Amino acid sequence: MTAPRSSALPSAIERGLEVLAATQDEGGSWKGDYGGPLFLVPVYVAGLELLGRPADPATREGFIEFLRGHQNPDGGWGLDVESHSHVFTSVLVYVTLRLLGIPADDAQLQRARAWFLPHGGPLSSGSWGKFILALLGLYSYEGLVPVPPELWLLPESLPLHPSKLWCHCRMVYLPMSWLYARRARAKETPLLAAIREEIYAEPYETVDWVAARERVADTDAYTPRTSYLRAANGALGLWERLAPAGTRERALDVVLDQIRREDEATNHICIGPINKVLNTVVWQSARPGGPEVEAHVKRLPDYLWRAADGLKMQGYNSSELWDTAFAVQGILATGEVERMRPVLERAAHYIESNQVLEDVREMEKGYRHRSRGGWPFSTRAHGWPISDCTAEGLKASLQLEKVGLNQVPRPRLREAVEEILSLQNEDGGWATYELQRGPRWLEALNPSDVFSTIMVDVSYVECTSACVQALAAWSAFAPEDAGWLRDPIRRGERFIRQVQREDGSWEGSWGVCFSYGAWFGTAGLIAAGARPDDPALRRAAGR
């Protein structure tokens, strides 16, 4: 629809409302580009190769356009579209373009080889890159840091049990462990054989694979391997040689059951793009062409987004609920309710229809937190509610309630409050999907090389602020609950104050770092009752 103009509003707000009205999806949400990481398309294409299902021409051309357009001047590709070149991404993108039909003598591919070969090529890639190459038969499994499935057989009380990891981390290493144990590998083709010859600076047959396990280029060593991790890798390597066959099979059964639970709970969407592809490959290896594979293949396109720079794989199946909740709050802040009523009604319907209404079946067996009443980042079908998404869904609903447009029944709004409360950590803050389960020292065992703070779901200022704001809004809406929520709000406020830096800033983790942190830090304190002359707010304002 086209929003009629109003001379009462500043032109910037006018244009903003017009854009929101014009870009709303028929289902009531706003869909946007959630791309950026450059290693996702290579993982997608690798998955297609392992499935034996090449990309259709339109998908192929879209991927090529995206990858070609983001090559750095030095010939490499970054971890994301704005980063310096990484061996991890550069090798994977090279392989991907070759799989998509680009010849080895292509000028861009020649520049890529000229960059990554002197940096060590696959032997110096971050660990995830080596793993994907191993799946394609372009890297030996002997050169991988072990990913044994037997970790899932450890007593659940131990901090090293995978259930203690941040859910994104454990859901990636879950299928990795199955594929590693099975030494899954794509069918050899002349093209793969040719690529294998192109990406190494030395003959493939002469590589010292055991030495390559701990080799990482400086470009990829964002989180350098600690002595603890190296010791753990050594112990796991020993276990890999000694693991009894019966124990391995039992562990693989446990892992496959956990994969099944994740697939069913997310309608085969999966929590994120990496485990989406890897889970698909697991089932193709376990039951080729079976119903699990077909169910996964149908949802693979959920992760694709076509933009001005080409076709990309997003970091989530969408960001719809998050974007819609903020769009609603932004529209309501203008006061133009009547003018935007049809837009708000559709958005209210989307918010209502995407609240999670029930817990995951046998959630304890799948190591899942409660879900009932929460909102996800994207869609209800995705099945993973998040603390701040629940908070923003609740805030948007309560603001819609004030203008008579909310469609979420009051009992379900209260369930959202209960979901938020269930996620408050002992330190008073809120993490993302779950309570903090493992100790922070687990980060010393981070095996990814290219990512940090992935091992444990810790409290963040953004999540904490959003939850404090939502609880404060509910207290105003339902005064009878104000006493019940007073202590959780105060604990959240204390956490926000504790993590403020000496210069008055907050370090954000889920947006544009300090700008994002300052926005949420100040908003959380104000919602908790801080006055304009509060020292923390004055420091945040630079006064």
Set out the residue ranges of the language-model regions.
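Preference for long, amphipathic alpha-helical scaffolds in soluble/luminal domains
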Residues: 1-543
